[in-house]
Regions:
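C-terminal, surface-exposed recognition/capping segments
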Residues: 5, 56-60, 65-69, 75-139
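Short aromatic-cysteine micro-motif
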Residues: 2-71, 75-76, 80-82
Length: 139
């Protein structure tokens, strides 16, 4: 389940130059992020880990602002939103995706994974850079 609209403003992932020890680092593997921290089902624990290690992380806080059960999706959870974009955007009241979205998947102390939901492109952004947040929750 994802929020019907983006968080009000673009925000930084946060905690730049600081590795989050509670969140696995996910590197490139033939151009694809794989492993613990990137998978479907990892977003909730990633978000909790981010906030444990850095309680001021704007993207994770933005996702949690919807409620305790909401979280920043992992990169593969975000990719599922891309794969189901047409279905999601057909829901009454759903605001169309725009530009890049943060995932809860960390790359290293300086970067985190993001996805351009219109095209499906995945890549990295500096943690101090700003992107959109679309919160999700498990069901």
């Amino acid at each position: 389940v994802c929020a019907l609209s983006d968080y009000a403003t673009t925000v930084a992932w946060g905690c730049s130059s600081s590795d989050s020890p509670s969140v696995p680092n996910v590197t490139w593997n033939s151009g694809n992020p794989v492993g613990a921290g990137a998978e479907i089902g990892d977003g909730e624990s990633n978000t909790t880990g981010i906030l444990t290690d850095c309680s001021t992380a704007p993207a994770a806080l933005a996702a949690r602002s919807y409620g305790a059960e909401w979280f920043l999706p992992s990169i593969k959870e975000l990719n599922e939103m891309y794969r189901n974009k047409a279905t999601l955007e057909a829901v009454s009241g759903f605001t169309a995706f725009s530009s890049y979205y943060w995932s809860s998947t960390e790359y290293d102390n300086n970067d985190a994974w993001r996805q351009y939901v219109d095209s499906g492109n995945q890549g990295l952004n500096y943690k101090y850079g700003t992107d959109n947040v679309r919160a999700v929750r498990a069901f």
